[in-house]
Design a protein with these regions (language model features):
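Compact, Lys/Arg-rich rRNA/RNP-binding cores from ribosome-related proteins
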Residues: 1-48
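Extended, folded cores of ATP/NTP-driven motor/assembly subunits in large transport
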Residues: 2, 34, 38-41, 47-406
Length: 406
């Protein structure tokens, strides 16, 4: 059989030129550190990196083990996982997968906030050409190697966007050592649950998290990620210097600008009594660079029960007021407004789930970030997304004058 060369890992560079090729974990000598620091300063001076862009990136320090210090005694870690073939599964398999995901979500208590993120970004085709190219060896199998390489590249070019999925969880701790211990335990438990679902997952190290942040900040302009841990020592550089875009502008209330692209942040207002599993899939199938993030935090069980019971008491009071009004008007007191009856049944079911089925109540926010080269194209994308949301009894609400916070 003819030999097929193994897939080559792309070289990860530092600096802004191709003359300094160093892997992320390669120690740098003093001359290389000096060269790198000069490259960063030159990029800042030329406007390739903006100081305000770094201030917008919401973390203080990223560590090699994947722990990120967010500030205010908060620390986070992320798990990358593969997409499960849920849509093609049978109804019975879907029910099992859904139940397992529910158990995963219920694992998180009120002291741990978590965020499910799906990042869709345009691939760097120049990098793919380097990776997929099989160099000739001078034998008779070179035409086959070229044909195979071209086929792989053609298939890669058919993919409009790449998709990365990660689960990020956040805890409060006194210092990074205490945070790392807690986060490692949570990571081990979550990975075990992903294994039960049948989904491949692994804890992300600091480089992987920075790479994903780099994708988030360069959705429309694929750029090679150039980074080295040793370059942060004794140079005054920060990991933000390597992932920051050329600029962030939030002067317009309904838009923001990141580098050459224009973007918008919206949240999903849920009005439906039940959300179907097709909603997220439909949102992600939009051919656009985007970030869909689901932020959730469980309420304390005691507080959740009090909230539901208080709501039931308010509904009972409203029923009594309606019955009194009906009697005074000469109507049948047993005829109540449909909304009161519906809300009462839903509240009773929720209380039953909380008390007897070990369910939890979560505070959930769903944010969507879309970017495009022009405002017109961005508005077309948002119009399509809003149509999907409306079909599921939801509304897409723009975060006016809160784009940076979003």
């Amino acid at each position: 059989m003819f030999p097929i060369l193994k897939r080559r890992e792309p070289k990860r560079a530092v600096g802004w030129g191709d003359e300094l090729i160093i892997r992320p974990d390669t120690p740098l000598n003093a001359a290389q550190k000096k060269q790198l620091a000069k490259a960063i300063k030159r990029a800042k001076r030329d406007g390739k990196i903006a100081a305000t862009a770094q201030q917008t990136i919401p973390y203080e320090e990223m560590y090699e083990n994947g722990v990120c210090r967010l500030g205010n005694r908060l620390y986070s870690k992320s798990i990358a996982f593969e997409d499960r073939s849920y849509a093609e599964a049978s109804d019975d398999d879907k029910a099992v997968i859904f139940e397992l995901y529910c158990r995963l979500v219920n694992y998180f208590g009120p002291t741990v906030a978590f965020q499910l993120s799906v990042v869709c970004y345009y691939p760097d085709m120049a990098e793919y050409r380097k990776i997929l190219r099989i160099p000739p060896t001078g034998d008779s199998f070179d035409p086959i190697r070229k044909e195979f390489s071209d086929m792989l590249l053609t298939k890669a070019s058919l993919c409009k966007t790449e998709r990365s999925l990660c689960l990020t969880f956040t805890v409060e701790a006194e210092d990074v050592k205490q945070a790392a211990s807690r986060l490692e335990q949570i990571q081990a438990d979550v990975l075990e649950r992903f294994k039960g679902i049948g989904t491949q997952a692994h804890g992300m190290d600091g480089y992987e998290r920075l790479l994903l942040l780099h994708h988030c900040l360069h959705l429309d302009e694929p750029q090679r990620f150039k980074f080295n841990w040793d370059s942060l020592v004794g140079t005054g550089l920060s990991s933000k210097d390597y992932i920051a875009p050329s600029s962030f502008l939030f002067k317009e209330g309904r838009y923001f600008r990141v580098g050459p692209s224009v973007g918008a942040v919206s949240f999903l207002q849920i009005q439906a009594t039940k959300l179907y599993d097709t909603l997220l899939n439909a949102l992600l199938n939009i051919e656009s660079s985007q970030i869909v993030s689901i932020h959730a935090k469980a309420l304390d069980q005691g507080a959740a029960l009090k909230t539901v019971k208080r709501k039931l008491s308010d509904l009972d009071k409203a029923k009594i007021d309606e019955q009194k009004r009906a009697v005074r008007s000469g109507f049948d007191m047993d005829i109540l407004p449909p909304d009161l009856v519906t809300f009462g049944k839903e509240a009773e079911k929720l209380l039953e789930d909380l008390q007897n089925h070990d369910e939890k109540m979560f505070m959930v926010t769903i944010l969507l970030v879309h970017t495009a080269p022009t405002k017109q194209k961005l508005e077309n994308i948002i119009y399509s997304v809003n149509g999907i949301a409306n079909a599921n009894n939801c509304n897409l609400i723009r975060l006016d004058y809160q784009q940076e916070q979003g």
